[in-house]
Amino acid sequence: MYLAFDRRVILGTRAVKTHTMDFGAFDSVNAPFAAEVNAHGLVVNEAVLPGCDPHFPLQDGLCRDVFLLKLVPGVDPRIFDALLHLGIRGIVIEAFGAGGVQFIRRDLTAKLHEAIHNGVSVVVCSQCLYERSDFSLYEVGQRALEQGVIQTFDMTSEAAVTKLMWVLGRTCDRLEVAKWFSANLVGEISPGVC
């Protein structure tokens, strides 16, 4: 899937709306434009186009029980209790910087462990639009990894939510979910990042 807007074509998994009023409302995050229209016509960047496996099965069943949580300083860990009570099967967490989840005072790691132990798939990405997350860099990310969260590398949060909905439509097994998230299916992860 692609998004074509303002003479630019963006890979759908990399498209993010960055402006509310500007005609160039969308940007391609962590990937060049797939194509641009200029005075010479449509100029396609073949290197950006993801390979297509003709035997890849069409799977249109999506799990709607996915929640996106943007961390803010001091977020109450009981938010995870509420999400478990609602029957959420997947959580995408927009963490701090390269990968940080608070564990001092309001410790989220115990609640991450509880959610994962109860069968919830928890994937983590960065609130930063550009570059990749790496939860192994700092203690605030390492503790989250120890609980079993799944990294999204340089995926946008929009792509992470969509991918989690798609994967949970296929399987609830956490190891299978992690396997799918370490695979670049349609250009959502830059080559060589994971």
Q: What kind of feature is each model-predicted range?
A:
Residues 98-194:
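C-terminal non-catalytic interaction/assembly regions of soluble proteins
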Residues 2-4, 11-93, 97-98, 103-104, ...:
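Accessory alpha-helical/coil subdomains and C-terminal extensions
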